[in-house]
Amino acid sequence: MSYLLRKPQSHEVSNGVKLVHEVTTSNSDLTYVEFKVLDLASGSSYTEELKKQEICIVAVTGKITVTDHESTFENIGTRESVFERKPTDSVYISNDRAFEITAVSDARVALCYSPSEKQLPTKLIKAEDNGIEHRGQFSNKRTVHNILPDSDPSANSLLVVEVYTDSGNWSSYPPHKHDQDNLPEESFLEETYYHELDPGQGFVFQRVYTDDRSIDETMTVGNENVVIVPAGYHPVGVPDGYTSYYLNVMAGPTRKWKFYNDPAHEWILER
């Protein structure tokens, strides 16, 4: 199995709380992005104290209450399945604060982390405030829910987005990268992909590769898998009959998403 691919686990961290994924700077090649997925049984709680990190808590499915002990957001979350294809609620919390998540119903929660030293206000990112985009043409169509885009000044370094790609389409395509700190041409952003498939027995293909091929990994990615993108191009292909969802987390030295297309495939945009 590729070192960039993580499969789900089910490790109980406390009563009613299971850890599904944990990507950290110590167990991956990432420096800026960390990521967790938790399953919370109804009535259970998870607490954590942030140090020099900010977090975006995404209510992937189910309903939760989130508090940093100054602000409390009750009964947030909008869907039982990501394939209802409607935006969800999220909460941004800045560094050096503690938070608690309580499950109002059975819930899956994504915790998206990046470095931060400047405190910013805690914020509820309402589902209706997610910017929705329809990108691409031909067989490269996808729908994007912008949870925490670079146009939103609510965070110091964190970017968070959900993407839906229909049967037979490609996403993050033509292949693009953002691994050079060379603005205005390109920004350096690490990235993680948390994938779900409908139906759940499906899979997608994702390739991560650099110009010099020091990274060149092509992966068969199953439901609830995570792909780590420390650098390089990272397209996703969705087979016929299945729908793809993924949650992206990005962060780097500058909070700007400026990508560079693979010149070998950029002609696709000129059709």
From Swiss-Prot:
Cysteine disulfide links: none
- Keyword terms: Isomerase
Q: Pathway it acts in?
A: Polyol metabolism; myo-inositol degradation into acetyl-CoA; acetyl-CoA from myo-inositol: step 4/7
Return one Gene Ontology term, BP aspect.
inositol catabolic process
Q: Offer an example of a GO molecular function term for this protein.
A: glucuronate isomerase activity
Name the Enzyme Commission number(s) assigned to this protein: 5.3.1.30
Report the catalytic activity: 5-deoxy-D-glucuronate = 5-dehydro-2-deoxy-D-gluconate
UniProt-listed InterPro entries: Deoxy-glucuronate_isom_IolB, IolB_Bacilli, KduI/IolB_isomerase, RmlC-like_jellyroll, RmlC_Cupin_sf
PANTHER family according to UniProt: 5-DEOXY-GLUCURONATE ISOMERASE
The record's family statement is: Belongs to the isomerase IolB family.
Role according to the record = Involved in the isomerization of 5-deoxy-glucuronate (5DG) to 5-dehydro-2-deoxy-D-gluconate (DKG or 2-deoxy-5-keto-D-gluconate).
Q: What is this protein called?
A: 5-deoxy-glucuronate isomerase
Gene name in the database record: iolB
